[in-house]
From Swiss-Prot:
InterPro entries: Ribosomal_Su5_D2-typ_SF, Ribosomal_uS9, Ribosomal_uS9_bac/plastid, Ribosomal_uS9_CS, Ribsml_uS5_D2-typ_fold_subgr. One of its GO terms (biological process) is translation. GO terms for cellular component: cytosolic small ribosomal subunit. GO terms for molecular function: RNA binding; structural constituent of ribosome. Keywords: Ribonucleoprotein, Ribosomal protein. Belongs to the universal ribosomal protein uS9 family. The keyword rRNA-binding does not apply. It comes from Rickettsia massiliae (strain Mtu5). Pfam families: Ribosomal_S9. This is Small ribosomal subunit protein uS9. It comes from the Bacteria.
Length: 159
């Protein structure tokens, strides 16, 4: 019993010495008032800047319709705005490198979601429930030696 008393006294002394201060992370906002975030998917990395505007989206100095030919890609990229009901309220400027079209689409989607989360903290719960803030960590499995592909093996003959 006396050991417990000594330990609790030590803990109480430590707590009374230094007040507990929670550090809030600095939001990535540049001088012009844009929210910055990076999104990743497969080998693609997207840098996204979000600012209050009229809903214009620019990807690598092209409009979103010019960069992504398929309408389904555009709809999936606009998903965070649909969930948070902020369509035509933010302008998006992003640069994407690496990967293919599908990976770039996922990277932009992830970056926009993270930037929206920084712009308004009440969007966090909505975006988290939609699964847009979690990074999709699936990447291509490497090819193993002695095999044709990552999982495919050469034909086996018993005799």
């Amino acid at each position: 019993m006396p050991e417990l008393k000594i330990k609790t006294e030590k803990v109480e002394k430590q707590l009374t010495k230094e007040p507990l201060v929670l550090k809030t992370p600095k939001e990535k906002i540049d001088n012009s008032g844009k929210f910055y975030a990076t999104g990743k998917r497969k080998n693609a990395i997207a840098r996204v800047w979000l600012k209050v505007g009229k809903g214009k989206i620019v990807v690598n100095k092209k409009t979103i319709a010019q960069y992504f030919p398929s309408e389904t890609y555009v709809k999936t990229i606009l998903q965070p705005f649909v969930l948070t009901k902020t369509i035509d309220q933010y302008d998006v400027i992003c640069t994407v490198r690496g990967g293919g079209i599908s990976g770039q689409k996922g990277a932009i989607l992830h970056g926009i979601s993270k930037a929206l989360d920084k712009s308004a903290p009440d969007f966090h719960v909505i975006l988290r429930k939609g699964g847009l803030l979690t990074r999709d960590s699936r990447v291509v499995e490497r090819k193993k030696y002695g095999q044709r592909k990552a999982r495919k093996k050469t034909q086996f003959s018993k005799r």
